[in-house]
Amino acid sequence: MLNKKLADFSLPSTGNKTFRLRDHAGSKLVIYFYPKDSTPGCTTQGQSFRDAHDAFRDAGCEIVGISRDSIKSHESFKAKQGFAFELLSDAGETVCNQFGVMKMKNMYGRQVRGIERSTFVVDAKGVLRGEWRGVKVPGHVDEVLSFVRTI
């Protein structure tokens, strides 16, 4: 997938919209996948992107977050955290599967299928230029922002 043009996709988005990848041609885009709204790690991850949102915008880059949660859950999470970017609902896991982020994980001693925390950077031509899988939140957003500034 890396260094290849992404296939277009569309998902329901907060703000009563539909996100279509093709509508963002001409802008760089960070797509971050996270397991679940309002959980500690996902909240910290979203807050980190929120706090760096202006810097990403100054670098010509938009941000979207994707999980399997409902739009209703996303709207609440977005409002509570003050996110200036949209959250996309992939309840059917179509885009999660396109990016290969669905993994078996250990939760409290048992195997469950869920989203592996991952971030992808798409350039203004729709080409996947960067990917981080199994993300640890501390320092991650700064690393992604530094990369975005190089493309």
What are these regions (language model features)?
Residues 1-151:
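Chalcogenol-based redox active-site neighborhoods
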